[in-house]
């Protein structure tokens, strides 16, 4: 009789564990579903909507920024490197603002550059766009060529604070 009683307690305990695990799985699936339902494309007001991508995609509290190149009004990279960097970062800032975020919400930045000797020119301008000392994780990688003569292409991920 005691053996049956112990088996029933174990079976009951296993049942409770399985029910609890199932509830957490349902909760996790609901959270993912809720985040996906809040997904929206971000477009700058002057965006070329003929291009097959968005300036960014906001999914829940996370913004994925498409690769950007610092092009002037003529659609080309400016002659001055500092101007190209500022145009690029101003565009990134504008995409973030469309999503209700700031540069300080960036958590990851990838910069492709056609001339790695420009690293030291890029950094002080880049740093000036942040108000926090806690900068995002970043990589600065070489690229053989970028579209429209650009020297830099930046893509990033931001998470709302």
Q: Over which residues does each language-model region extend?
A:
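N-terminal presequence-like segments and the immediate start of the first folded domain
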Residues: 6, 11-90, 94-99, 104-107, ...
């Amino acid at each position: 009789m005691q053996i049956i009683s112990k088996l029933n307690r174990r079976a009951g305990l296993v049942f409770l564990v399985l029910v609890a695990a199932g509830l957490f799985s349902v909760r996790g699936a609901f959270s993912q579903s809720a985040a996906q339902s809040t997904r929206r494309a971000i477009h700058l007001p002057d965006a070329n909507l003929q291009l097959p991508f968005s300036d960014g995609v906001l999914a829940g509290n996370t913004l994925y920024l498409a690769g950007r190149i610092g092009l002037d009004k003529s659609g080309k990279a400016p002659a001055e490197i500092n101007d190209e960097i500022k145009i690029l970062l101003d565009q990134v800032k504008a995409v973030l603002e469309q999503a209700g975020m700031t540069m300080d919400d960036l958590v990851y930045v990838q910069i492709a550059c056609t001339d790695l000797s420009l690293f030291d020119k890029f950094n002080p301008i880049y740093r000036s766009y942040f108000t926090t000392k806690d900068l995002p994780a970043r990589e600065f990688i070489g690229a053989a060529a970028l579209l429209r003569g650009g020297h830099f292409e930046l893509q990033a991920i931001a998470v709302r604070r």
